Amino acid sequence: MRILWIVAVCLIGVEGSVIEFGKMIQEETDKNPLTSYSFYGCHCGLGNKGKPKDATDRCCFVHSCCYAKLPDCSPKTNRYEYHRENGAIVCGSSTPCKKQICECDRAAAICFRENLKTYNKKYKVYLRFKCKGVSEKC
């Protein structure tokens, strides 16, 4: 599984510590993060253009905005640790940057879970040329 995530990073440029973020998504949604979210809508994976297609796509938009607030933390590559307490994700605090990156990923994974009922398979592999217009501001 770890090798699959490393390959995914190289191929599609998924942001963040892909291993931890992918694990969070899997735990929260019971969906394969690579196949279910990497190409979803206009804001998941590569992209960030146009209006989010639905609530799940908005989760990705907000996640990108969260990372944009942490440019000095290298959120695309900085690994972190987290654990669970009573089923809830708890971010470790080894450094402020790692904690903030983890909190961005935690919020996105929870957002995906909260919007599972409106997950739309037609956006699962959405062609990015359909994403038109300027993206709203964070």
Curated annotation (Swiss-Prot):
Q: Where does the protein end up?
A: Secreted
Q: What is its main location?
A: secreted
Q: What is the effect of changing N48G?
A: Enzymatically active in presence of calcium with increased toxicity
Calcium is among the record's keywords: no
PROSITE patterns, alphabetized: PA2_ASP, PA2_HIS
Q: Name one Pfam family in it.
A: Phospholip_A2_1
Q: Outcome of altering S64D?
A: Enzymatically active in presence of calcium with increased toxicity
Q: Which domain of life is it from?
A: Eukaryota
Protein role = Snake venom phospholipase A2 homolog that lacks enzymatic activity. Is very active in inducing myonecrosis in vivo and shows a potent calcium-independent membrane-damaging activity in vitro, most probably by binding and incorporating in the membrane. Also acts as a presynaptic neurotoxin. A model of myotoxic mechanism has been proposed: an apo Lys49-PLA2 is activated by the entrance of a hydrophobic molecule (e.g. fatty acid) at the hydrophobic channel of the protein leading to a reorientation of a monomer.
Name the record gives this protein = Basic phospholipase A2 homolog ammodytin L
Upper lineage is:
Eukaryota, Metazoa, Chordata, Craniata, Vertebrata
